[in-house]
Amino acid sequence: MKTKTSIKQICNLCKIVRRNKRLVNTCKLHKNHKHKQK
């Protein structure tokens, strides 16, 4: 299953989660960064 990877090359540690028709990449290292990014 290939999904448009437009959210900056997703790293292997990042997991793509589909929520409310929205692509959310939950990263263990980018977890804090994701919250800061609006």
UniProtKB/Swiss-Prot annotation:
<dbReference type="GO" id="GO:0020011">
    <property type="term" value="C:apicoplast"/>
</dbReference>
<dbReference type="GO" id="GO:0005840">
    <property type="term" value="C:ribosome"/>
</dbReference>
<dbReference type="GO" id="GO:0003735">
    <property type="term" value="F:structural constituent of ribosome"/>
</dbReference>
<dbReference type="InterPro" id="IPR035977">
    <property type="entry name" value="Ribosomal_bL36_sp"/>
</dbReference>
<keyword id="KW-0689">Ribosomal protein</keyword>
<keyword id="KW-0934">Plastid</keyword>
<comment type="similarity">
    <text>Belongs to the bacterial ribosomal protein bL36 family.</text>
</comment>
<dbReference type="GO" id="GO:1990904">
    <property type="term" value="C:ribonucleoprotein complex"/>
</dbReference>
<dbReference type="Pfam" id="PF00444">
    <property type="entry name" value="Ribosomal_L36"/>
</dbReference>
<protein>
    <recommendedName>
        <fullName>Large ribosomal subunit protein bL36c</fullName>
    </recommendedName>
</protein>
<keyword id="KW-0687">Ribonucleoprotein</keyword>
<dbReference type="GO" id="GO:0006412">
    <property type="term" value="P:translation"/>
</dbReference>
<dbReference type="InterPro" id="IPR000473">
    <property type="entry name" value="Ribosomal_bL36"/>
</dbReference>
<keyword id="KW-0933">Apicoplast</keyword>
